[in-house]
Amino acid sequence: MYAVIVTGGKQYKVAPGEYLKIEKLEIATGESVTFDRVLLVGNGDDVNIGAPVVAGATVVAEVISQGRHDKVRIIKFRRRKHHMKRMGHRQWYTEIKITGIQA
């Protein structure tokens, strides 16, 4: 069984037992989180597509950890002007484990 969920403005295809890094959620480590914006639920050849969401479908996950991704380095410079600016960004994430899909 698998599902497509929306969280943090992105869509993820998930299945029970999968680990996933999503945009940061303000939920403590070890707690459970429920995603109710389920766009699609599939079980073998039986696929249920929502319009826009599947009615009554939820995905339950457990929060494993919070952290930050690797640094993305940014360099801005102006040609011929001896001007260069170096910056970086580390995005926060929440790692979850999918525990169940109810359709």
UniProtKB/Swiss-Prot annotation:
GO biological process, one term: translation
Keyword Lipid metabolism: no
Gene Ontology CC annotations of this record: cytoplasm; ribonucleoprotein complex; ribosome
Keyword Repeat (UniProt): no
Pfam families: Ribosomal_L21p (PF00829)
Alphabetized UniProt keyword annotations: Ribonucleoprotein, Ribosomal protein, RNA-binding, rRNA-binding
UniProt-recorded Gene Ontology molecular function terms: rRNA binding; structural constituent of ribosome
Quaternary organization: Part of the 50S ribosomal subunit. Contacts protein L20.
Annotated function: This protein binds to 23S rRNA in the presence of protein L20.
Family named by the database record: Belongs to the bacterial ribosomal protein bL21 family.
UniProt name for this protein: Large ribosomal subunit protein bL21
Organism: Pseudomonas syringae pv. tomato (strain ATCC BAA-871 / DC3000)
UniProt lineage: Bacteria, Pseudomonadati, Pseudomonadota, Gammaproteobacteria, Pseudomonadales
